[in-house]
Amino acid sequence: MKIYCVGDSITWGATLEEDISRRWTDLVAAETEHEVINCGLNGDTTTGMLMRCHTQLFPQKPDLILFLGGTNDICHTWEYRQACANIVSVVLNAREQGIPVMVGIPLPIVARRLLPRPWAPDRDADFIAGQFEAYARWLEVWCRERDVPAVDFHRPFLREDGSVREELFSDALHPNAAGHRLMADVLCRALEDLMR
């Protein structure tokens, strides 16, 4: 199966530039029969991803698009509504063209590692972390209610008590090599379930 993974720096593997073969997408490609194409773009928002789907990916007629986005939407605007609208648009437009979409539920963030934003004192790290949590829950419910396949990258990065597994991150947002390994394992299981 040819899988196009659309995303931002988390998909691209921004913190693994020295060895991009350790990105989650590359690990999945190496460990399965699937052809996995990394379409991550550092700094991209779901609006940019939506446009890239229309101009670059839909014409390729992939067997599956994995859409993992929203991190930059929240970091730039402090809310997730536009990301929700863009994901709905991608899924509906892809379905019209007969292209299956799997939605990735994004990672949590390490709130204490976020840099303070003096121009927005009412938007502290805990507020932003709450937006990520709310977005993840919205995606989970929306995908379930609409019968859209989803891969939950969020919960595996949390401990049982709900705290973030910081050892899997290189900074506030990006997974390190161990985090990429975990993402690959999660996606491999999700693809197995999808193929059943």
Predicted feature locations:
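Serine-esterase "nucleophile elbow" of acetyl-processing enzymes
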Residues: 1-48, 52-61
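Alpha-helical cap/lid subdomain in secreted, periplasmic
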Residues: 26, 30-31, 35, 51-196
